[in-house]
């Protein structure tokens, strides 16, 4: 086992705390080559595709990447903004706003963001945090509902990174927040704001990203957490069971995934005479390809072409103030016990003690 070279140890330094907001990732550009690189990394993760590696290698490299990369690039191009990928833009802004809000609340922490796939790569961000002297790191996945296909993959990447480090920092992980009051309230405010302007629909469809059905039978709690989020949001909105429903989108491959599927369900609703539907994607905290293209464009077409009259997509929480405050509340809960809020008098004392420690180390022969 070989380890990476560590930065020089600095005696008397004050340990720093960091929060890493981690999202799924995105291609660097809406081009076939960039999308191919991204898909290769994403679909090579055994957490994402549970097929024997040898078999999957041939499927991925001989079928999926040659044909799907170009198709996906066109879809990315349809939602790409002047700032870049919407998912990356929103995640970066969320991290900056969370950093500022925690600072206003007195926390001395550094908030950064990383992507599980693509850039900024999680290992690169972790190396920079080490160089910055961060010895306590809290990981905040951008996924409210836990899944082995998403959240656990972040944990895997973090653990893998630190197997090659000698000096490992204190690590904490937020597993999920699907039923956190602040998250549910932020969703309610988002929906209610839309309804205050446009009125209520005949049906509110809550569309979550799908996963293979077998993951449910094998013990993944994702399905249950999605339904709990939906139930709590419906309660906040005072909806009856007939006024909302849960669906699952983004099916990939031929295997059975969690049902009902979003697109066929919308078509069915239109044919049954449901004139207006509003669709929200509570599992996505930043708008991205799956919301802006798959739902706002494709799902709209499916519903309207089947006879629907009015389709509204309610955007993700993105930089909504209620969501930033919710993120802060969730983060603060998991920062308990770490000295991120230090009174000025105590901070001065800590600096004095650090100076004494540093001078004593130098007296004994330390370089730094």
UniProtKB/Swiss-Prot annotation:
It is found in: Cytoplasm. Its EC number is 4.98.1.1. It holds the Pfam family Ferrochelatase. The keyword Cell membrane does not apply. It catalyses: heme b + 2 H(+) = protoporphyrin IX + Fe(2+). One of its GO terms (molecular function) is ferrochelatase activity. Catalyzes the ferrous insertion into protoporphyrin IX. Belongs to the ferrochelatase family. This is Ferrochelatase. The lineage of its organism: Bacteria, Pseudomonadati, Pseudomonadota, Betaproteobacteria, Burkholderiales. The gene is hemH.
């Amino acid at each position: 086992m070989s380890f990476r070279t560590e930065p020089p140890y600095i005696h008397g330094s004050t340990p720093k705390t960091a929060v890493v907001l981690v999202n799924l990732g995105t291609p660097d550009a809406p081009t076939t080559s960039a999308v191919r690189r991204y898909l290769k990394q994403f679909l090579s993760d055994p957490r994402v595709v549970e097929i024997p590696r040898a078999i999957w290698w041939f499927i991925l490299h001989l079928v999926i990447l040659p044909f799907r990369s170009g198709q996906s690039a066109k879809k990315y191009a349809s939602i790409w903004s002047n700032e870049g990928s919407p998912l990356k833009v929103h995640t970066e802004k969320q991290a900056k706003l969370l950093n500022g809000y925690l600072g206003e609340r007195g926390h001395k922490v550094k908030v950064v963001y990383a992507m599980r796939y693509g850039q900024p790569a999680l290992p690169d961000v972790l190396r920079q945090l080490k160089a910055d002297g961060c010895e306590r790191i809290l990981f905040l996945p951008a996924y409210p509902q836990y899944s082995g296909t998403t959240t656990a993959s972040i944990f895997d990447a973090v653990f893998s990174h630190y197997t090659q480090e000698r000096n490992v920092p204190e690590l904490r992980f937020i597993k999920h927040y699907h039923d956190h009051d602040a998250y549910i309230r932020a969703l309610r405010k988002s929906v209610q704001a839309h309804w205050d302007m446009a009125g209520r629909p005949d049906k509110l469809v809550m569309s979550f990203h799908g996963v293979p059905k077998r993951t449910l039978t094998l013990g993944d709690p994702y399905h249950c957490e999605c339904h709990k989020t939906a139930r709590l949001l419906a309660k906040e909105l005072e909806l009856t069971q007939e006024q909302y429903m849960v669906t699952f989108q983004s099916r990939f491959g031929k295997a059975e995934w969690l049902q009902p599927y979003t697109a066929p369900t919308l078509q069915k609703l239109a044919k049954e005479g449901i004139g207006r539907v509003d669709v929200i994607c509570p599992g996505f905290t930043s708008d991205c390809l799956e919301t802006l293209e798959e739902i706002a464009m494709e799902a709209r077409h499916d519903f309207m072409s089947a006879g629907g009259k009015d389709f509204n997509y309610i955007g993700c929480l993105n930089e909504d103030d209620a969501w930033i405050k919710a993120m802060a509340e969730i983060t603060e809960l998991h920062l308990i016990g770490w000295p991120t809020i230090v009174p000025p008098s105590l901070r001065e004392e800590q600096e004095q003690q650090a100076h004494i420690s540093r001078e004593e180390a130098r007296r004994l022969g330390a370089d730094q």
